[in-house]
């Protein structure tokens, strides 16, 4: 994973001192901005190719600054007035996405809904439209979210409105919270809301069919065994000849004895594990359950 640091964030009136490098290694470019973008493009492309060659199951992605380009500089840009990936950091994020050089994208939309220069609502719709060819997650600023009131409901912060926006856009697959310490400290009840409202149930890693579209085989020999610590569910990994076909994680579901099995209902997930076993809860032995294990 790479964060948002490509060329340095610019200081007013200062240029990055790379004129000697440009003169020596310009590769025929007459425009320094194009040369800088190409330097970053080459880096991203070569990292992607190296990861694919060495460990093709590993994902490589970025979390770029939240504005690609302003509409003032590009008709396809966002209706914003701020620093730009393309023009100021020399990071052509859309090129990386469209060429398949990154496996996911997490734009840092750290502003609030209604920000005069970089409106969260505006930006999330822009990224959802223009960066949908790779998994898209939204980078969220926890403190700015909880410290800003919802314009439609001033008694609450902007977390509910932002979550509603995310979930209304089919190409947005989730969000990342910045930074973790503020989630851990439960700033503005953020962690409580995640646990009780938005992420009550475990989530599976989104599919990446552009990397591998073949699911692992079915688990084998699922059985319950009594141990000195109580009942344990065991299973055997499916066979796989290729590294890409190996099962990495297993999902354990639990249903009532006569309940219809529905693997699309995340409320029935009791474990996501890399182990080949799961200790079963045991109360009085009278309540019966069905367990399903998938790879």
Residue ranges: model-predicted function:
Residues 1-101, 110-111:
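Polysaccharide-binding and catalytic clefts of secreted carbohydrate-active enzymes
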Residues 32-59, 117-145, 203-207:
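P-loop/Walker A phosphate-binding loop and immediately adjacent motor/lid segment at beta-alpha junctions
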Residues 82-84, 110-115, 240-242, 268-271:
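Short, contiguous acidic/charged loop-to-helix segments that flank catalytic cores in large enzymes
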Residues 90-116, 131-210:
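Substrate-binding cleft of secreted/luminal carbohydrate-active enzymes
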Residues 189-246, 285:
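Pro/Thr/Ser/Gly-rich low-complexity, intrinsically disordered linker/stalk tracts
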Residues 238-264, 288:
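Solvent-exposed loop/turn segments flanking beta-strands in beta-repeat/beta-sandwich domains
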Residues 273-279:
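Short S/T/G- and acidic-enriched coil/turn segments that sit immediately N-terminal to beta-strands
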Residues 279-295:
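Beta-strand-rich modules
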């Amino acid at each position: 994973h790479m964060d948002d640091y490509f060329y340095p964030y610019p200081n007013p009136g200062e240029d990055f001192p790379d004129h000697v490098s440009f003169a020596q290694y310009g590769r025929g470019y007459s425009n320094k901005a194009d040369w800088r973008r190409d330097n970053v493009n080459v880096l991203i492309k070569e990292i992607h190719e190296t990861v694919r060659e060495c460990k093709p199951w590993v994902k490589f992605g970025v979390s770029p600054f939240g504005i690609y380009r302003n509409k003032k500089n590009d008709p396809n840009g966002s209706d914003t007035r701020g620093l730009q990936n393309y023009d100021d950091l020399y990071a052509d994020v859309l090129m990386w996405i469209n060429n398949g050089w990154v496996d996911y994208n997490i734009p840092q939309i750290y502003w609030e809904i209604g920000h005069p220069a970089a409106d969260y609502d505006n930006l999330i719709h822009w990224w959802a439209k223009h960066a949908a060819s790779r998994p898209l997650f939204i980078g969220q600023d926890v403190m700015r979210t909880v410290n800003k009131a919802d314009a439609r409901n001033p008694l609450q912060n902007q977390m509910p409105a932002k979550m509603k926006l995310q979930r209304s856009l089919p190409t947005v697959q989730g969000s990342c919270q910045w930074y973790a310490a503020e989630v851990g400290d439960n700033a503005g009840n953020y962690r409580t809301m995640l646990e009780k409202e938005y992420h009550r149930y475990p989530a599976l890693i989104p599919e990446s069919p552009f990397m591998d579209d073949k699911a692992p085989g079915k688990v084998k020999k699922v059985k319950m065994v009594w141990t000195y610590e109580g009942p344990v569910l065991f299973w055997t990994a499916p066979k796989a000849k290729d590294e890409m076909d190996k099962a990495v994680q297993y999902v354990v579901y639990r249903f009532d004895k006569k309940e219809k099995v529905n693997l699309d209902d995340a409320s029935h997930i009791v474990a996501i594990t890399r182990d080949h076993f799961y200790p079963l809860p045991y109360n009085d032995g009278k309540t019966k359950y069905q367990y399903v294990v998938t790879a």
